[in-house]
Amino acid sequence: MGTTILVLSKILTFLLTTMLIGSSVIQCSSVTYDKKAIVINGHRRILLSGSIHYPRSTPEMWEDLIKKAKDGGLDVIDTYVFWNGHEPSPGTYNFEGRYDLVRFIKTIQEVGLYVHLRIGPYVCAEWNFGGFPVWLKYVDGISFRTDNGPFKSAMQGFTEKIVQMMKEHRFFASQGGPIILSQIENEFEPDLKGLGPAGHSYVNWAAKMAVGLNTGVPWVMCKEDDAPDPIINTCNGFYCDYFTPNKPYKPTMWTEAWSGWFTEFGGTVPKRPVEDLAFGVARFIQKGGSYINYYMYHGGTNFGRTAGGPFITTSYDYDAPIDEYGLVQEPKYSHLKQLHQAIKQCEAALVSSDPHVTKLGNYEEAHVFTAGKGSCVAFLTNYHMNAPAKVVFNNRHYTLPAWSISILPDCRNVVFNTATVAAKTSHVQMVPSGSILYSVARYDEDIATYGNRGTITARGLLEQVNVTRDTTDYLWYTTSVDIKASESFLRGGKWPTLTVDSAGHAVHVFVNGHFYGSAFGTRENRKFSFSSQVNLRGGANKIALLSVAVGLPNVGPHFETWATGIVGSVVLHGLDEGNKDLSWQKWTYQAGLRGESMNLVSPTEDSSVDWIKGSLAKQNKQPLTWYKAYFDAPRGNEPLALDLKSMGKGQAWINGQSIGRYWMAFAKGDCGSCNYAGTYRQNKCQSGCGEPTQRWYHVPRSWLKPKGNLLVLFEELGGDISKVSVVKRSVN
């Protein structure tokens, strides 16, 4: 009997062991750090990480994205936590769909990677309001990100909520889960100088609060040089080989190695050559760095109204190794994969010693690491931006391309050079899907009735977000002006000029129901002015200004105080009595569009809506027009997009879900040749000059049904829906 039990016990042990080996689920129990590296279960690790933000893709995409990240050589998935997505109103929480944080982390765990959970809860990230819920702005006495009681109370409450949720699911490494790191605050250093002692006090409070949550894993602060112990301060940037942590017993970590850059409407599309990105990573490693996170590894899509900035595009592709649609971008993906393999071959030596640096020439160096049993690793570097170099190292000859590093895991043989790219460049095409739009219909916003429903009236011009609370991009400002019958312009004289000064971001101007034009700011200059001659009549004239937000700011000192909307002046010039300032007269305000209040985007919207159908629906190209059409899901499994080049500016929905803002703003910039060598900045390698910044808009296949998918567009400027199409993204 004893023998039988022993045999059964061995069989059970074998089966359990086999299951664990076959499973890639991460199992941790101890995460600490020392001066060299993050230490997991007693072992120093070189950790390669990539940012994937769960709301910027769909749950159906997550597993494939994470598997591609693992296959690309990553150890860790990094993500922010998006407060405004999770707590849209005080005490009301959302952890469903794209905001299902638990499902996202479980997926990472099941694939077999670690997690760096950057709780913040300020995220920046080109995300609307930097991740803060707009209601937070209206808490009595609040001031963001400083030694302020109301802010600290709200921040602590949300942070505790997330930490407790992670603990309940046993997600922290100390519980056997995948979370090995957490971040409190984010990129605070740029704002610290302006805050003085209150800023330092806030940093110390945030650190103490986070550590007191007893997660059992290290906490970091990125771009915060005075992060107090035991918090690890880390680096963000295009390069971080210059960075040293604030204490000699902390590891050297790079939380954001920028793989590219974001795009803004009206701007070019930045590209970062992979040769330079790999060079930056290898430079960091050879200087003793042990943790690198690519921001972004998959950028994804700013669905809905989540894009910040303002003026950040719906696409958040970021020139990442995995593109917006979930396809690998070559040669970036494979070249970095080969870099990761080379670094991992060197791991034992890299975490065992500091580099010994030897000059090999004016621009050339050798960084040598050694470990036990004669182990030797070398990084041979050529910093020259134009010329290759021939060097001698260990009595052997090597050729180093310009601006490159060769990695020698045995101090003899080169296994990788950052500037020598073997992978072929992806050939990306947007091809017809075969799916056509049918049952096209149109609904025109009724300008004449604005001011008659759901309005407030006040003297003077009100700040936009104070009225809308960011429930909509749109706010109507309407007023009436009386014109004397004796005005000379009514008898053939020059029309008066209307000027409107706005704090951002766009405005469409109507007088007596007639459209007189639009004006826009930019991300760099949100404020702008509109000016146009207008045809007024004797008696009462109605001025209607539709102010449009294009994402709330996500970065800058106390950006919660920045104004949006028409808060400058509104003036009529050229009247017989001179100028007439309308700014302080009675104005009526209406948040949102009629189509929004009627829920025209919903597949179950009221059938009594008077849509214009048939050929007439395609003929009107006036501003403020709703379009709807239907299409069937294209065959195959290629990613899909809407081609909106024929449209102007607005928003788009598929089956009631917003795919984001669109705008055919044409890119201005210098799109000349791009040399990988030399220091990279976001304006160095530009593409897309003379084309719309974003023409195609991602349509997740999981949002579609086989037949009868509803497309709704709200067009602000005037467009041609007959030329809108559904396309497939093809990569060869």
From Swiss-Prot:
List keywords of the entry alphabetically.
Apoplast, Glycoprotein, Glycosidase, Hydrolase, Secreted, Signal
Gene3D superfamilies, sorted:
Galactose-binding domain-like, Glycosidases
Is Hydrolase found in the keyword set? yes
A GO cellular component term found in this entry reads: apoplast
State if Thylakoid is listed as a keyword: no
Which residues are the signal sequence here?
A: 1-23
Give the matching InterPro entries: BetaGal_gal-bd, Galactose-bd-like_sf, GHD, Gly_Hdrlase_35_cat, Glyco_hydro_35_CS, Glycoside_Hdrlase_35, Glycoside_hydrolase_SF
GO molecular-function terms, A-Z: beta-galactosidase activity
| GO BP term, pick one | carbohydrate metabolic process
The entry's active site is E187, E256
Question: Where is it located?
Answer: Secreted, Extracellular space, Apoplast
Sugar attachment sites are N466
Q: Which residues pair up as cystines? A: none
- What catalytic reaction does the record list? Hydrolysis of terminal non-reducing beta-D-galactose residues in beta-D-galactosides
The source's domain of life comes to Eukaryota
Q: Could you say which EC number(s) this protein's record lists?
A: 3.2.1.23
Q: In which tissues is it expressed?
A: Expressed in leaves and flowers.
Name the family the entry cites.
Answer: Belongs to the glycosyl hydrolase 35 family.
Q: What is this protein called?
A: Beta-galactosidase 5
- What lineage is on file? Eukaryota, Viridiplantae, Streptophyta, Embryophyta, Tracheophyta
Q: Which gene encodes it?
A: BGAL5
